[in-house]
Structure formats: structure tokens, C-alpha cells
């Protein structure tokens, strides 16, 4: 058998000051009637002159008026010593120290100063003998001041009038529950005069439950948390000591003579024939406690309308064993005792007669025996020992090991702040101050039992059963975890899909973003238009430079063409910069990263390596969808631009001039400065109603691309998505080598220009760049081969040769 663990402990003393009752508040003296009332006295005497009126007494100090002066002083003493109301005699400094009968509120201090002033006034006409009388008076005054002065007490805990039931329980009883489950006995008892709140602290009310109900609730919660590791057996008893007789509150029909206190060889105090009950839930405990409180003896007195006339003792016995089957069985047992003592009484205050007087005498006798035991325990230090009168009362016999034995004890002392309980409060504080000196030696109540060889087969069977239970429990836990994980993943998937759908609906339904996409498409369309115009201008420059006969006279035209070509180049570059700028379209994706992503990361089972990759892939495909829509719309705009006669003539002016030689080439070049206004009038039709300008084919392409967003999650788990960038390339403007013209090529002039204009815009290629360099281009749309050379100059040269002939 293992040696029990032993620890040193001491009684924890907590003071609780009850608030004033409604009746006491009506009689409470107003201490703060002015600044002078709150100013503390410094202890020095007042100045006084002979033959003058005293401001306090208005009595002329004269030998002839001695009788009048003495009567006036007597009335003054009676007025101050015996106030009409009550006063507060307890001040809580902090959570540990209190001041009993503070000096600034003690009326005796004020009376002594007045008496001293009168005595010193009479001593002014006396001789040397009167000086000795003055010294005697000072000594008397100091004795009075010292006798009626304030007293400071320091305890383990202090609760003022505003402390709640929950706070009192948490700081006094709650720490004992872990000790009880660890195998140490614990006791909580409330001590104090009648009407000070002991029963309220222990039992409470339905709206403000006391420590019994709060302790039982927390105890069963702790037992529930440990039920997988240990088996618990709980028993409960509830008794009262009334007129030195024990009554079973849960079985009141049991005669008191049969309930006898016994002490076994293991120093355990038990009551023979007391009923023990075995509650399974905290509700069962509450029902038993309520039943016992109904059977408890209470009677109205002058001091308390519902005065407890007995000491109530509630004991909860807890035995626990380990569920793990071993060769040695560990048993741990402990007892939690909660005791509500009856209040000490004064016959004059309670005005009890007959039976109530007899009850009060027995209560005081048992409390006196308790006080004697506390005094004796305080005298039992290491150097001396004395007899402790536990057998003077049945109460002290029950509290024998709670006070000086194997038990952790908390003493909740309830006091009244009213001056009407002056003596009871002072005596209670003195007893509590002595009780905190008591030392106890607590021992863990644990017992180890070795199993017999014959029980090994039973132990093996029990272990197999436990193994099967653990396996089933593990399977259930795994199944629950997997189910929970799947549900969380489904929630994450739904949240991501909702976020993606919201982005798609924003792009498709908000007019601001539709206009922004239309502007992007118009930028590409205008860029393509300016490139074709610039191509015609550059071809005209080459044509005039290679024609030696007309080079000199056409020099002003060449100069204007070069100026216009440079301006067109700058405008194309400006459009490319405008297209690459951050606009409202990118703000939607940015909002997802800055706001929605943070909310998604707060969801349970969010995985950065899986869920974030899936979200980024969806957002990238939405961005790709918007770029594809812009490209498709730009191609549609370009096709409509080809059918516009005015704009079409701007990039075919060279071929028309070569065929007709009219109008003058200088006027054609001058008219090129109006291409911005002409293109703006063309673009207004798309800005005014962007949706009606695109065909159903475009919408079908967009919907088909949107359907591609449903990418299987497995394919995205290890896929890296790099940032998309736009690579701008200009079409090859180098002229073709001069070849002898062929007559059959003449009809191809307009066909070649139309083919150039109708090409899908491939000058902007969407190429993927990563840290290692450019990779294979993404192909949201069908790739179109780039033209290496422009063939329109061949037709131009053949026409010139034919004209010379």
C-alpha cells in the first residue's frame, strides 16, 4: 500500500459584510452632512478664553453657574452618545482588510473633546493642584479614546456589501472541488450572528443560488469530464442539530435517539442510522437539498423573520476508481461538507421567550463550544499542547476533523455593518481572527488494493471489453471527424462558389463594369484603326521616296506624312498605356483578395495549399473571361468599323488615290487630322447601348468560357498560376521588295486591303510570364498567324508601272 500524501494547510477565513436592510436604511445616520463632518479630528484641544461664550455649549464658564454648566454637559453627552439612528461600523479597505468602528464616525471621540474643553476651562483658575487634575483628565481622555478607537482586521478574503453570490462562491468554495476530486476532504461553513446572511450565502434564493447549488453544478460538470477515465460513486446525507439532537432532514421519521455520532479507527466521523442517497445528476442533488430545507427547523424572531433554529450539515461523499484495469486497484474517496450554522443570539435583542429562549440557549452553547475549540486549537502550536473540548457539543464533534484534522476548511464569516449589532460583530471578528491561526494536516484519502490471482481471468475479460469499447469509440470519433471535415469543406466550397458567382454577376450586371469593358474594346479597336492608317501613311512615304521624279515636289507632303506618322505612333502608344492602366474592372478582384479572402481564411479547415489555389484559379479564369470578352468585342467593333464608309476610306486612301488621282493627295493628308472626331462619333453608338451592339455569337462564346470555370479540384491542387501580363507588339511595317508588276494583280488591290482590315487583332498577344521567363501563351481564343510582310505595295508598284506606259 502506498504511503498517503500529506500536506500542511490552514483554515481560510473569508468575511462577508451584508448590506443594510430597508428598515435599517431608514434609520441610518447621514454621516456626510457637510465637509466638517467628514474631516477627521486631529486630537488637539480647542482654544477658549475666560468670560466668553463657548460656541459648542453657549454656557458662560463661571463658578456661579457650575450647576447650569454640568446640566448642559450632561444633556450634550446624552445627545451625542445616544443618537437617534444607527451608523455604519465596518469599512472595507480592500479585498483583505477591514476597519471596525472607524474613528471618524465614532461619536465618543466628539464627546471626549467637548468634555476636555470644559475641564480645561475650569482648570484655568486653579492652582498647581489643578494642573495635576488636568493631567489626570488627559489620561482619562486618552483611555477613552483608546478604548473606543478603531480596530483593523486582515483576513484571507473580504467581500463588501456589493459582492455577488457568484463571486463569493468562486473565491471560497470553487477551489475546493479540485481538492475533493484529488482525494482531500473539504469543509465550508458559515459562521456569524443571527440575521447576518449565513443561510442566504449557503442556500441562496431561486434567482441568486447559494454555494450549495453552485458547487453541485460545477462538481457534476467536472465528474462528467472525467467519466471516460474514472468511475464515480456519489452518496449524499443531510442532517441538522436541533437542541443538541440530530435529525435526518431527508428521512425525518427516523427517531433522534437512533442517530448517534460514531468515530471509527480511521478517524472518520459518522452518524449511525443516517440515510444516504445516491444521486445520478445534479437535478437529483437539487431536489434532495430542497427537500431537506423544507424539513429544516425555522422560526420567526425579533432579529430575523426566518431564523434558522438549528445547524444544518450537508455531506457529499465521492468515491472514484480508475477505469483502467490493472493488477492494483486505486480507490480515492473524499467528503465535501457544507455547513450552515445557526446564529448566535442575545435574549434582549431577540426577545425570545419559552421554546425560542430554550433554542437560543442551546445554539449559544454549541457556538460557545465551537469558540472554545478554536481557542484551544490556536494554543496548540509546536511548543505546547492543550486539551481540545470537542465533546462539549455535538456540533464540535462533527467538526472535529474539519477544524483540526484531515480537511481543507473555508470559514465564511457573515457580519452586519449596523451599529445595532456592535457587540456581536466585534466578537465574531475576534473569533474569525483567531480561527485563521489554526493549522491542519491534510492527507490524501487513497487506497491501493492488489487483485487476487483468481481475478486475473476477470481482469483479462474486462480489458478485452475496454479494448473493444476504445476501438468503437475511435471509429466513431474518426467518423465524426471525417463527417465534420467534409461538411466544413462543403461550406468552404459553397463560400468560394458564392464569391465567384458574385464576381461574375458584378461584371455582368453592373452598368459601370459593362461600360468599362466597352471602353477597353474601343481602345483596342481604335489602336487597330490607327495602325492601319499609319500603315497607309508609311506606304505613301515609301512610294514618294522611291519615285525620283516626284520626290522633290512632293517633299512637303512627305514631311506632313512623317509628322502624322509620328503622331499616330504616339497615339498608339498612349492607347496601349491606357489599356494597361488599373481601372474599375480590377477593383472587383482586388476586393475579393482584401475582404472576402480574409473571411474565408477564418472558416474551419481552410487549407492554403488547396482552397486558396482553387479560389485563385477561379478568379484567374474570370479575369481571362473578361479579357476574352474584351477581345471578342474589339473584333466585332473592328468589323463594324470596316463597314463604315468614312472610316474605311481613312486607311484605303492610298489605293483610291492611285487609281483615280483625285482628290489631291495634300488635301487627303490634311483631312487625316479629323480621324479622332470621326472615331468618337463611331464609338458613341457602343457607349450609348453596349449590349445591343454585340451578336448572339459573342454571348455564346462568353457563356461557353464561363462554363469552363467548373474545374475539378483535384487538378488544381498542385498547379501554379503565374501572373498574366500583356505583351504589346506592332505589325511589321517593313515594305516588300520591289517586284516587277503583273497585270493580273491589279484586282487584288482592294481585296488585300480588306483582308488586312478584317484580320482579328493579333497585335496584342496575351502571353504568360513567370519568374523563369515567357512560357507558352495561353490560348483563350483561336490563334491567328501573323503576317510577315504587307503585300499591298506590290499592287501599288504595278499600278505605277502601268500608268507610265
From Swiss-Prot:
Record region (Disordered): 720-805
Residue ranges with Low complexity bias: 774-783
Main location: cytoplasm
Keywords from the named record: ATP-binding, Coiled coil, Cytoplasm, Cytoskeleton, Microtubule, Motor protein, Nucleotide-binding
Superkingdom in the source lineage: Eukaryota
Chain coiled-coil ranges: 449-481
A GO MF label: ATP hydrolysis activity
Keyword presence, ATP-binding: yes
Entry-linked Gene3D superfamilies: Kinesin motor domain
Residue positions binding ATP: 192-199
SMART domains, alphabetized: KISc
Compartments, record wording: Cytoplasm, Cytoskeleton
GO cellular component, one term: nucleus
Pfam families named in the record: Kinesin (PF00225)
Polar residues composition bias: residue spans: 764-773, 792-805
Keyword match Nucleotide-binding: yes
PANTHER family linked to this entry: CENTROMERE PROTEIN E, KINESIN-LIKE PROTEIN KIF19 ISOFORM X1
This protein's name: Kinesin-like protein KIP3
Organism: Saccharomyces cerevisiae (strain ATCC 204508 / S288c) (Baker's yeast)
Lineage: Eukaryota, Fungi, Dikarya, Ascomycota, Saccharomycotina
Record gene name: KIP3
